[in-house]
């Protein structure tokens, strides 16, 4: 039986905010018996070891390339159940600085390899910190975290992911600036009537995060005061800045961190 819009929206809210691992379905309980972690955040199917091999060969459940927190079947399922809800989340945007100039100094193949190293390094760290990749676009990566997926310390994990990404990119000589913010956004599967959809987050706080990231120089992580407070991190001696952001009516206070 098809779910109503209200049921779909509640599913999205509870899954993101409450606990992504509390689905009480028989197949979920069964999958949890198979070794071993890491697992799909929705159905609990294992990705590695013998359990992962069984899931891939018998059930056709491989790890999603875009969101390693999901298996491919669950990602397809949530995309087909379009809907969403306003939820508390933490958001991260990371951009390569001076990408146009870099591309002019490199062959197209070498530039593509640099972008790929950026994508691979960033998404691996986001997955390790239980974040969800929203998009890989051009020279940027966007991701978000919620309590149901990453735990109650999801804002802290977002900041930790930003520090790891910054350190990883510095080691690879890839100039990246990062912005981190937290607030309420609309989260869910959005798309067209023909069934094409993406798991996305939209709203003022998402736009604010993108604008914050645009102000970060290479090697800098600009974290909003709101995110720092929610993470329980004391600003201490961290450099303070007040940003005027395009399209944002109010100034935004941030602190400067590094990897």
Where in this protein do the model-derived segments appear?
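Catalytic core of nucleotidyl cyclases, primarily class III adenylyl/guanylyl cyclases
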Residues: 125-157, 168-204, 252-254
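Regulatory cytosolic signal-relay segments
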Residues: 1-87, 235
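Catalytic NTP-binding/metal-coordinating core of nucleotidyl cyclase/transferase enzymes
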Residues: 81-160
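Cytosolic regulatory/linker segments at or just downstream of nucleotide-handling modules
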Residues: 215-259
